[in-house]
Amino acid sequence: AAKRDATLARLHPTTSLEAAGRADFVVEAITENFEAKRELFKRLDSICRPEVILASNTSSIPITRMAASTKRPDRFIGMHFFNPVPVMPLVEITKGRDTSEETVATTVELSKSLGKTPITSLDYPGFIVNRMFVPFVNEAIHALMQGIGTREDIDQGAKLGLHHPMGPLELADYVGLDTHLYICDVLYEGLHDPKFAAPPLLRQLVEAGHYGRKSGRGFYRYAPDGSRIADR
């Protein structure tokens, strides 16, 4: 309890972006949308001190493309934390075309100081993890569409057969089906590989406003507290 209270005492929530001017390192974690991130980084670039590193928690948007919206591409980097962040030890650090080695080293050390295990990747569509993860989830959705298995059996198969802590469908609900769809589109646009194309069922669910846990409905149904509701 004492450790928790000490940690909370160091947090200073604010709705003012100007507060970032006092930061030594900035990590952006807004919605997965390039235009929104680009506008935010343009503002942060003018607010933060010149030596401050700007990092994005993006899981799919090119780092070099976002860095171009700032005057510090050498101090711009990808720093993706995985859901659920409190229990997932991995941080994927992605180097843009102009990211300096000093920026990479600082970000690696910061990740370690947070108790995370960092890996580094180059700035290519999907980086490392989503290059593997997106086709996996897409295949699970195709299996559901084709009636090969129920959503429960597909998720149980991944958990017990592949030793995954969450099944692909429940994890997609957790991440957000709209987010997964956006990542599919980014990867398909960048790589033109059909395995990254969004399954029709995924697109249909998103168009219906079923985004997963945050909307109360995705592949499963959820209560306001995020707990799953059993189908009647």
Spans of model-derived segments:
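Structural signal for conserved beta-strand scaffold positions within catalytic alpha/beta enzyme cores
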Residues: 13-15, 77-78, 120, 221
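Buried hydrophobic positions in well-ordered alpha/beta secondary-structure cores of metabolic enzymes
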Residues: 11, 26-29, 55, 83, ...
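Rossmann-fold dinucleotide-binding core
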Residues: 2, 53-123, 127-131
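N-terminal alpha-helical segment
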Residues: 23, 37, 86-90, 136-137
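Rossmann-like NAD(P)-binding element
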Residues: 1-54, 61-62
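Short acidic capping loops at alpha-helix termini that bridge into adjacent secondary structure
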Residues: 9-10, 50-51, 73-76, 152-153
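Short, residue-level hotspots on alpha-helical faces of the histone-fold
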Residues: 131, 135-139, 160
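NAD(P)-dependent Rossmann-like dehydrogenase/reductase catalytic/cofactor-binding core
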Residues: 102-105, 112-123, 142-146, 151-232
